[in-house]
């Protein structure tokens, strides 16, 4: 039913949808949702931080940036067997996807990347969808991940191109788009979304949805995060997002990207079950489960399963939309590492609150 998908949404059109009376917005979103998806099925993904902290970037929301003092303990890359154990646990808890996150600016060819490729092979062989979020990557690196059996690659746009400059100064918005472009040259699906509650306007939220919805095909998954303001980060003072904003954002995302999995991501601990149920009604059909999301608290998986039971919802099986990728063993790989790293722009502007948080961390 992809004939309903439109790739030329304008910012004004999206703002008009977002601002509709809530009952109309919910009705429209729920109608589209039911045409494309089973409303009682929700995908459960588990996020694993395979390498935490110590990142050289300055993202204003992020407790893993080395320059901010947030109490995050940096650690080394997890071993393949540790990851396998976590994936098996996730599978037994109803997850159909494992997303592995490394706090890297970009992928570097070498031992650590080889280890990540082995993790991808291992999880794909457990018959689970594998997703990675490892920062920027080259086309060759994307090909090697695809060959290992990667199902999805996550690279969030975070916000609109305009507001991006107030969040991050160590790379540009166009660098995000380039990595997504590199992933799309392979058969790996794209997962890309953003964060609300960073001080952005509704125009910025719409701008982010323009950037995502004009991709063709549209992303397979779009995570919608509510900022969790962490002490020590530049955004520690931001007020929590109201549940109505989350519901509107989910509904609007569903309307402009009918076939996408819309994922409730960070910030669910601050949402009541009623609030989450309204998000599911509005078109959210994916959640992150597990005790924490990288470094942020998350509801207990048993609580989530109880909520599903209350709502009469079931967890989605893996590989419903796209067939399971085949895994090619390292020895049979068609792609040699090129020893290259992604190029990125250095925008050169400064962000006052990021600098202040960085100075404060040294005191």
Swiss-Prot record:
Tell me which residues bind [4Fe-4S] cluster: 55, 59, 62
Gene Ontology molecular function? 2 iron, 2 sulfur cluster binding; 4 iron, 4 sulfur cluster binding; biotin synthase activity; iron ion binding
The segment(s) forming the Radical SAM core domain are 40-268
EC number(s) given by UniProt: 2.8.1.6
Q: Which UniProt keywords apply?
A: 2Fe-2S, 4Fe-4S, Biotin biosynthesis, Iron, Iron-sulfur, Metal-binding, S-adenosyl-L-methionine, Transferase
Enumerate the Gene Ontology biological process terms. Answer: biotin biosynthetic process
Residues that bind [2Fe-2S] cluster: 99, 131, 191, 263
What does the record say about how the cofactor binds? Binds 1 [4Fe-4S] cluster. The cluster is coordinated with 3 cysteines and an exchangeable S-adenosyl-L-methionine.
The protein's required cofactor(s) are namely: [4Fe-4S] cluster; [2Fe-2S] cluster
> Subunit arrangement?
Homodimer.
- Its biological function? Catalyzes the conversion of dethiobiotin (DTB) to biotin by the insertion of a sulfur atom into dethiobiotin via a radical-based mechanism.
Family per record? Belongs to the radical SAM superfamily. Biotin synthase family.
Q: What is this protein called?
A: Biotin synthase
> From what organism does this protein derive?
Flavobacterium johnsoniae (strain ATCC 17061 / DSM 2064 / JCM 8514 / BCRC 14874 / CCUG 350202 / NBRC 14942 / NCIMB 11054 / UW101)
Gene assigned in the entry = bioB
């Amino acid at each position: 039913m992809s004939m309903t998908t439109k790739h030329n949404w304008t910012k004004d059109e999206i703002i008009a949808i977002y601002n509709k009376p809530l009952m109309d917005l919910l009705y429209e979103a729920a109608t589209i949702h039911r045409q494309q998806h089973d409303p009682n099925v929700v995908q459960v993904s588990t996020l694993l931080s395979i390498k935490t902290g110590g990142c050289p970037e300055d993202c204003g929301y992020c407790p893993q940036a080395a320059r901010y003092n947030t109490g995050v303990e940096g650690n080394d890359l997890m071993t393949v067997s540790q990851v396998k154990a976590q994936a098996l646990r996730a599978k037994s808890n109803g997850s159909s996807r494992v997303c592995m996150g490394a706090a890297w600016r970009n992928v570097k060819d070498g031992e650590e990347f080889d280890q990540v490729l082995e993790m991808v092979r291992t999880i794909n062989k457990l018959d689970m969808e594998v997703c990675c979020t490892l920062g920027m990557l080259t086309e060759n690196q994307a090909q090697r991940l695809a060959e290992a059996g990667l199902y999805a690659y996550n690279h969030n746009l975070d916000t609109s191109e305009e507001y991006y400059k107030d969040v991050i100064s160590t790379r540009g918005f166009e660098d995000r788009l380039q990595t997504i472009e590199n992933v799309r040259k392979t058969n790996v699906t794209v997962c890309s979304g953003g964060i609300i509650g960073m001080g952005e306007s509704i125009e910025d939220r719409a701008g982010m949805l323009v950037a995502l919805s004009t991709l063709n095909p549209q992303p397979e998954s779009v995570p919608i995060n509510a900022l969790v303001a962490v002490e020590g980060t530049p955004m520690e003072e931001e007020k929590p997002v109201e549940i109505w904003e989350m519901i509107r954002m989910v509904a609007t995302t569903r309307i402009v990207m009918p076939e996408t999995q819309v994922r409730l991501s960070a910030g669910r601990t601050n949402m009541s079950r009623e609030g989450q149920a309204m998000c599911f009604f509005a078109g959210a059909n994916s959640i992150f489960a597990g005790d924490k999301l990288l470094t942020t608290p998350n509801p207990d998986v048993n609580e989530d399963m109880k909520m599903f039971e209350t709502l009469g919802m079931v967890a989605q099986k893996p590989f419903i939309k796209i067939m399971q990728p085949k895994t090619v063993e390292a020895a049979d790989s068609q792609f040699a590492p090129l020893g290259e790293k992604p190029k990125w722009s250095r925008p050169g502007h400064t962000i006052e609150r990021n600098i202040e948080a960085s100075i404060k961390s040294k005191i």
